């Protein structure tokens, strides 16, 4: 189970990286993070089980924020695909600020909560010793790097467009209402 969890987190991170659809990219990311949880639970120590449960909670909260921002983009800007997000943060700065926070947490950048849960999973794997937990630890590192690539691809596209973003008709893209 440890080996399957390790393999799944890399494979699904690669699948997420390939996705052009914004919400589908987040969905594959969820599967990848569920394999972190599976890997940690399969270590079968108290520390690993606690880390697994912590990552379940942390990932749930952060992924809700990511999906809410993706839903706001879909509903208020009518954009579904990652290439369509070019320069959209100019029209939806609060939405993309929230997505940037979610991206930092999902990637595991300190001091965000995603770092804490991934740190505890990594510590549990290293404390057990042996080659299989260390292979899992390496898989978690590779997956975290892939997560940084596919999440910050969206962030950079939205905040720093490479090309002149196509003009969006006035009022067609705006922030979600507060209530």
Can you say where each PLM-predicted feature lies in the sequence?
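Extracellular interaction modules
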Residues: 1-5
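Hydrophobic transmembrane alpha-helices and their helix-loop junctions in integral membrane proteins
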Residues: 6-175
